[in-house]
């Protein structure tokens, strides 16, 4: 009987440490990207906010996006990404969806509540919801 009691106590302790099922940390509902085309430049107004919500550094997201678009650009003081070249919002949103699938979404539980971790030359997605650690291609 005591071993059963200990088992139940250990289970209770385990469940108290696990996050609640279905709980959302705020990263599950991402803001829409505000994309403006001014002349021959494309500006993403809320780029810094978007990167904060997915828990990725601006530099990493910018590097991926600019590499895929094959265009120069930079993040200004206001947190806006300024890209040299005219790109439609559909193209940018498609590329960011690919980035989310490859470098943000947990392959095990599909949660966006993850962090990107670099160990030596390897990159990993570490899920904060289920604890899974998935290797990804380096940027």
UniProtKB/Swiss-Prot annotation:
Which InterPro entries would you find in this protein's record? IF2/IF5, TIF2_bsu_arc, Transl_init_fac_IF2/IF5_dom, Transl_init_fac_IF2/IF5_N, Transl_init_fac_IF2/IF5_Zn-bd
| Keywords associated with the record | Initiation factor, Protein biosynthesis
**Domain of life the protein comes from:** Archaea
**Key word Protein biosynthesis present in the record?**
yes
Named from the GO MF annotations, one term is: translation initiation factor activity
Recorded hits in SMART domains, A to Z, give: eIF2B_5
Matches recorded under Pfam families:
eIF-5_eIF-2B
NCBIfam families given for it? PRK03988.1 (NF003067)
Q: Which PANTHER family match?
A: EUKARYOTIC TRANSLATION INITIATION FACTOR, EUKARYOTIC TRANSLATION INITIATION FACTOR 2 SUBUNIT 2
Q: Which family does it belong to?
A: Belongs to the eIF-2-beta/eIF-5 family.
Q: What does this protein do?
A: eIF-2 functions in the early steps of protein synthesis by forming a ternary complex with GTP and initiator tRNA.
| Oligomeric form and interacting partners | Heterotrimer composed of an alpha, a beta and a gamma chain.
Q: What is this protein called?
A: Translation initiation factor 2 subunit beta
| Origin species | Saccharolobus solfataricus (strain ATCC 35092 / DSM 1617 / JCM 11322 / P2) (Sulfolobus solfataricus)
């Amino acid at each position: 009987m005591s071993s059963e009691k200990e088992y139940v106590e250990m289970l209770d302790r385990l469940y108290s440490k696990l996050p609640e099922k279905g709980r959302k940390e705020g990263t599950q509902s991402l803001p829409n990207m505000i994309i403006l085309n001014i002349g021959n430049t494309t500006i993403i107004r809320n780029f810094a906010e978007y990167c904060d919500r997915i828990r990725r550094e601006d530099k990493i997201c910018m590097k991926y996006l600019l590499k895929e678009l094959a265009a120069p650009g930079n993040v200004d003081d206001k947190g806006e990404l300024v890209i040299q070249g005219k790109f439609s919002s559909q193209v940018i949103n498609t590329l960011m969806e690919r980035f989310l699938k490859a470098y943000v979404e947990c392959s095990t539980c599909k949660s966006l509540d993850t962090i990107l971790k670099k160990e030596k030359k390897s990159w990993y997605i570490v899920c904060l919801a289920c604890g899974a650690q998935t290797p990804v291609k380096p940027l």
